[in-house]
């Protein structure tokens, strides 16, 4: 019995050590990662098309991103608007680009919504933000980091609150398509 308890501690310590090493490897990888998109580029394109009808603005933005980054934006037949419930807010998103370290998506709400930013390492204690979007708010969203780790926040409301498993499937399929596109572009060049 004593040996069994001791073995559990050894396994727990080993698991903790593996997790620490894995976290360090991911941290180092992100530090050396070259990104496809730049914050300034996405912001400039968003400003360029601001004020247009959102459908026209989004279609022009997609064309421009494909021109600037061939092989990194999903083709039209794989673009799909998906409902999103996260942090208490609701809207719709269309994933344009996804990799292990960055994403670009279109997001909006026709009715307006509010919620919170979630708990992240960016926000210290008491610094999490509330968000509120009015009716017909549409935007381009760009994110960097360990993207698979953000899926917990993005999908928790869908799994445990709305239990909309079809939306869960569509969301995961969109992300898988983005990863597949990045992988084939990496292996075969810009025209997978």
Could you say what each language-model-derived stretch is?
Residues 103, 130, 148-150:
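Eukaryotic short linear interaction motifs
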Residues 134-189:
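Double-stranded beta-helix
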Residues 99-101, 124-126, 136:
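Tight coil/turn sites that cap or link beta-strands
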Residues 93-95, 120, 130, 139:
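Conserved hydrophobic/aromatic beta-strand scaffold that supports enzyme active sites
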Residues 101, 106-111:
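Glycine- and acidic-residue-biased ligand/ion/polar-headgroup-sensing regions
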Residues 1-17:
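N-terminal Sec-pathway targeting helices
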Residues 109-133:
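Short acidic-glycine-tyrosine-enriched beta hairpin
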Residues 25-99, 186-192:
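A short, N-terminal "cap"/entry segment at the start of jelly-roll beta-barrel domains
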């Amino acid at each position: 019995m004593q040996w069994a308890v001791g073995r559990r501690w050894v396994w727990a310590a080993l698991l903790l050590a593996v997790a620490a090493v894995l976290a360090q490897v991911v941290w180092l990888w992100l530090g050396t990662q070259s990104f496809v998109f730049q914050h300034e580029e996405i912001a400039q394109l968003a400003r360029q098309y601001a004020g247009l009808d959102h459908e026209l603005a989004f279609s022009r933005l997609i064309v421009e991103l494909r021109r600037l980054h061939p092989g990194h934006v999903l083709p039209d037949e794989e673009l799909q608007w998906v409902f999103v419930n996260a942090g208490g807010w609701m809207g719709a998103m269309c994933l344009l680009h996804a990799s292990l370290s960055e994403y670009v998506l279109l997001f909006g709400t026709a009715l307006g919504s509010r919620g919170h930013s979630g708990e992240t390492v960016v926000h210290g204690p008491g610094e999490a933000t509330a968000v509120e979007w009015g009716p017909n708010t549409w935007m381009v969203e760009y994110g960097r980091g360990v993207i698979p780790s953000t899926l917990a926040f993005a999908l928790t409301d869908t799994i445990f609150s709305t239990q909309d498993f079809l939306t869960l499937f569509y969301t995961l399929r969109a992300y898988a398509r983005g990863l597949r596109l990045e992988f084939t572009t990496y292996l075969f060049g810009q025209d997978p």
